[in-house]
């Protein structure tokens, strides 16, 4: 049986064994003690088990400023996009509340959103964070895997199935969820003229998405459809589902320039060109999306267009360190669990950001770069009890030397000579 106190007579948590001096709070029960850390862990386990249990009270939707503030805890920069999303989401759920509480003479339409920005600029993260703020079911789909009904590939209805599964098959909750469709630019028509032949992965997908974006009662096969043709279908009304579509839309800047009648100057620094492209990107209008290859009906169902900027070196360094779920904080915590302190030199973070820019992966590529740097460290440290600190230097970030380990006696050695 677990002892409730140690040799010095200090009370201990009955679950983890920590003394009252090692925790903030020790709660007493009949013959048992539990610390605040174990309480928090239990809460997390219960939340995971229950999944989505309580959803937003649509009468108390956070105001746009509150939404933007919470988004800023997780997403660095992109202020224009955060404002546009905050307003669109607030209006969307205000509309739902208005429709549910009383009969309206004026019918309020849906404000589906189109996010335009380079790879790794934060489109998916913004959509995920919005769903987390509102505590609503959330699903992600890749437009490139979709085909219209009757062709090999994923049916549009499968997107709705993912949302229903996210809501633990509670259709009523799923009907107020958020769906993010990525790579929507990849299903653009290849030219402005309608295709003579069937376009299975392009215009056909846009046509298939039209009804669910606008609002319809869709029949969704609970097991995914084609492999189980005789299953009972789930009916779901998509009228109150918020759809966010996103894509890089490579080359749309040129379309904007042509529309504005401005000539492209063939010289200048990469930095200047980047700033110029961002300026044009912020001026995208529905006409440009039409030229790019989206069909008019599809564009009409995306009234809100928000653009994201290419992340520069400073923004990527901030992403590494500042958000609540920043990668540097995560890796520090992982090593902390092995009683080892992790330090990234400021110049090392700059090198990591430069590498992400070089790879053209944006924030999305940061984790794989750090994983590569940290591989030997995370392999070595769990088997050693004489290491107190790990230092990632600028050269280590560039791959020119190994990360440095500080031992208990204060000496610092490269990781490969530590075995």
Swiss-Prot record:
One of its GO terms (molecular function) is protein dimerization activity. InterPro entries: AAA+_ATPase (IPR003593), ATP-dep_Clp_protease_ClpX (IPR050052), ATPase_AAA_core (IPR003959), Clp_ATPase_C (IPR019489), Clp_protease_ATP-bd_su_ClpX (IPR004487), ClpX_bact (IPR046425), P-loop_NTPase (IPR027417), Znf_CppX_C4 (IPR010603). Zn(2+) binds at residues 13, 16, 35, 38. GO terms for cellular component: HslUV protease complex. Pfam families: AAA_2, ClpB_D2-small, zf-C4_ClpX. ATP binds at residues 118-125. Residues 1-54 form the ClpX-type ZB domain. HAMAP family: ClpX. Component of the ClpX-ClpP complex. Forms a hexameric ring that, in the presence of ATP, binds to fourteen ClpP subunits assembled into a disk-like structure with a central cavity, resembling the structure of eukaryotic proteasomes. Belongs to the ClpX chaperone family. This is ATP-dependent Clp protease ATP-binding subunit ClpX. The lineage of its organism: Bacteria, Bacillati, Bacillota, Bacilli, Bacillales.
């Amino acid at each position: 049986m677990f002892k409730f106190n140690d040799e010095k007579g200090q009370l201990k948590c009955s679950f983890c064994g920590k003394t009252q001096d090692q925790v903030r709070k020790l709660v007493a029960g009949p013959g048992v003690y539990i610390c605040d850390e174990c309480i928090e862990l239990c809460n997390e386990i219960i939340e995971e088990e229950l999944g989505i249990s309580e959803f937003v009270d649509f009468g108390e939707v956070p105001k746009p400023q509150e939404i933007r503030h919470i988004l800023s805890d997780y997403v660095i920069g992109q202020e224009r996009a955060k404002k546009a999303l905050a307003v669109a989401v607030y209006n969307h759920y205000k509309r739902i509340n208005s429709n549910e509480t009383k009969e309206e003479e004026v019918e309020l339409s849906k404000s589906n959103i189109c996010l335009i920005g380079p790879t790794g600029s934060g489109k998916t993260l913004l959509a995920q964070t919005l769903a987390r703020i509102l505590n609503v079911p959330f699903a992600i789909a890749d437009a490139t895997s979709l085909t219209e009904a009757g062709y090999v590939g994923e049916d549009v209805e499968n997107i709705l199935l993912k949302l229903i599964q996210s809501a633990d098959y509670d259709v009523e909750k799923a009907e107020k969820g958020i769906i993010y469709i990525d790579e929507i630019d990849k299903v653009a028509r290849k030219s402005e003229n309608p295709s003579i032949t069937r376009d299975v992965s392009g215009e056909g997908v846009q046509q298939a998405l039209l009804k669910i974006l606008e609002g319809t009662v869709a029949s969704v096969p609970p097991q995914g459809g084609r492999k189980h043709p005789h299953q009972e279908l789930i009916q779901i009304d998509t009228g109150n589902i918020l759809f966010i579509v996103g894509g890089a839309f490579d080359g749309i800047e040129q379309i904007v320039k042509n529309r504005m009648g401005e000539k492209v100057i063939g010289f200048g620094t990469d930095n200047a060109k980047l700033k110029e492209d961002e300026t044009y990107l912020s001026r995208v209008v529905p006409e440009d999306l039409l030229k790019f290859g989206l069909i008019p009906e599809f564009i009409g169902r995306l009234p809100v267009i928000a653009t994201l900027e290419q992340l520069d070196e400073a923004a990527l360094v901030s992403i590494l360190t500042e958000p609540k779920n920043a990668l540097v904080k995560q890796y520090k915590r992982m090593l902390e669990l092995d009683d080892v302190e992790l330090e990234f030199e400021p110049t090392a973070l700059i090198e990591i950001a430069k590498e992400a820019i070089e790879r053209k992966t944006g924030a999305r590529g940061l984790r794989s770069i750090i994983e590569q740097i940290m591989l030997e460290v995370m392999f070595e440290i769990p088997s050693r009890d004489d290491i107190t600190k790990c230092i990632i230097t600028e050269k280590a970030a560039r791959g020119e030397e190994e990360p440095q380990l500080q031992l208990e006696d204060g000496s610092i050695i490269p990781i490969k000579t530590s075995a």
